[in-house]
Amino acid sequence: MSGGNRATIIAAAVMLCVLLQTSISSAATFPAGGANGWGFNMNGWPNGQTFKVGDVIEFKYMAGMHNVVKVSKAGFDACDGTGGQVFSSGDDKVTLVQGTQYFICTIGPHCSNGVKAAVTAN
């Protein structure tokens, strides 16, 4: 194999690797609650959706009316935001890591009324 052909093959292989990495690592953005947004209509969301590590959940809501608190499983089950990571801008973006992440609203009885979601990223 001549030096020119080898260089061409190596360059093509490098380009293929770059293209594969780009398509594998591209993250998707999902609106929390779908078209309804983060609020009282969370029933069934995110059922049926597939999330990957690096995907982004976008929480849109009226600041002051809701918030988003990333909590443990125990906090999720008990609707207890103590020690959780609080987001309150009304346009919050959370990048998913491996495993299940739990989100609740700690305003009034919102969490116990269904303003909560568990999202699993693989």
Question: Positions of the model-derived regions?
Answer:
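A generic structural signal for short coil/turn motifs at secondary-structure boundaries
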Residues: F40-M42
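Extracellular/periplasmic metallocenter environments
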Residues: S2-A11, C17-W38, A63-H66, D77-N122
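Beta-strand acidic-aromatic groove motif in beta-rich domains, primarily in extracellular
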Residues: H66-S72
